[in-house]
Amino acid sequence: MFALLLRDGSRKEIEAPDLWEAMRMALRLDALHLEVSGDSPRQMTADQVRRELALDRPGLFDAYAPGWVAPSVEEFRELLRVAELSGSKAGMLVGVSQGKIRKWAGGEGEVPYAVWRLLTIYAGLAEATRL
């Protein structure tokens, strides 16, 4: 059993098949904490959830700057899972073929900043910013 403590102070119980999916739901809903019940109950902060999902690299969700480093294959795949996007849905969202999404998810080439940024905004992990 899992529960989220949301930013408005409310508590929401969620159904998830495992801890990984509960953590993804916590990110999707921008929860402050994820409560994990069971034999050894615990609470995870939003930062701990990002760390566990390997989405905690400094600068990963920042606006573009010279020297920006493209996401790793693992970061890209995890973002697709958090956003609940298939390759075809992600491709339609950002205007590329699903084959291109699959190639990036398979480690062929680097994900362009614009694609990464659109997907992070869609997932709710970054805000649209003005230059």
Task: State the predicted function of each range.
Residues G67-L85:
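Short, amphipathic alpha-helical "recognition" segments used to contact nucleic acids or chromatin
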Residues E84-K100:
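Short alpha-helical DNA-recognition segment
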Residues K89, R102, G107-E110:
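Catalytic cores of nucleotide-sugar-dependent glycosyltransferases that transfer UDP/GDP/TDP-activated
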Residues V94, W104-A105, V115, A123:
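DNA major-groove recognition helix of helix-turn-helix
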Residues E110-L131:
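DNA major-groove recognition helix of helix-turn-helix/homeodomain DNA-binding modules
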